[in-house]
Amino acid sequence: MIKKELQFLRNLVKKQVNEYSVIFINGDKDYNGVLSGYLEEYEQKEIDQKLSLVSNNYYFYNNPSTFVGDIILNRIDLNTYPTFIYSTAQIGLDINRRSFIPNFSSLYNIHSLSSGGYQLSLMQNKYHYYQLAKKFCRIPKTYIYRDSSFDFSKIEQSKKWIIKPNLECSARGVKLIKDINELKNEVIVASNIYRQDILIQEYIVGREIEVPILISKNKVIALPPIKVNKNFEYLSQEIIDTEKYSFSILQGKICANLQKTAEEICTNLEARGLCRIDFILDSEENFWLFDIAALPLISTHSSCYVAFRDIFPNDDSALYEAIIGAGLSWLV
């Protein structure tokens, strides 16, 4: 059933390959000093190449300012075909960092292949989406440190805790605290570095599972859950940056429940395009929401790529065609 639904989206692309435009907008980590969520150069080049192969009218910008200027000065034809953007660019460092380009583009009837500006901001804010998702699944006990008025005495000393910046991704600033006596200092240090709220979250022992979700006009499609294979207690910034982990397809009856829950969360958040819901699966097969990726990585070393490869072996275009097809579905 999943393959049939994805193939329908791919067929939209194959039938209309000359009748739409795609603009990929990136901004490297030096563009405005972003702390996380940027693409490495080799990832950007891979995505650029593969998007260009599934659109006959294709543009790439590695500077969001140049894109904005070209639109304002009418240097891109927006009238002949529907135009889509796939933007990984970030403007600024606050919660709206990913929203500027989609919001600006909507003024010119350019359609986003990801969620809209509001949803991107919502899914940037971990503490808020935990509150919205807790009616669908378990959430680890979570406190939010905003300033020095926080009462550390309420933290249970018998547990291990994870600290993480509220607005960052890619494990930026994530740290496992085993000694409760170090917690306060580590939180204050993180707050000073990242200049944002810091989450203090109960550490759940278990396997990390990622569930890619593709949202089209008429369907929320949960792909096969992917297991993160690692020899570490958790994915830290260093492990992610050096890719010291791999992916494999999760097996077992729990998969259907994970997929259903991931679909419910994305529907509740009104997400669009490709998203990813990350869980921790404990020894009793209880699953806990760990993270939400509004713009998950789609290069070769990613759970999204592995999920599509499982459904469409040896077909590198499948993932990219499905993303564009989901965008086209809203115009049919």
Task: Please report, for each region that a protein language model flagged, where it lies by residue.
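Short beta-strand segments
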Residues: 25-26, 164, 201
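C-terminal active-site "lid" helix and adjoining low-complexity regulatory extension at the edge
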Residues: 281-332
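Flexible, glycine/charged-enriched surface loops at secondary-structure junctions
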Residues: 200, 272-276
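Amphipathic alpha-helical segments that line or abut small-molecule/effector binding pockets
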Residues: 151, 256-263, 317-328
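Phosphate-binding site of ATP-dependent enzymes
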Residues: 180-260, 281-288
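A short, flexible beta-alpha/helix-coil linker loop
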Residues: 28-32, 167-170, 243
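ATP-binding N-terminal substructure of ATP-dependent carboxylate-amine bond-forming enzymes
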Residues: 1-112, 118, 128, 146-153
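A conserved helix-loop-beta module that forms one wall/lid of the active-site cleft
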Residues: 102-175
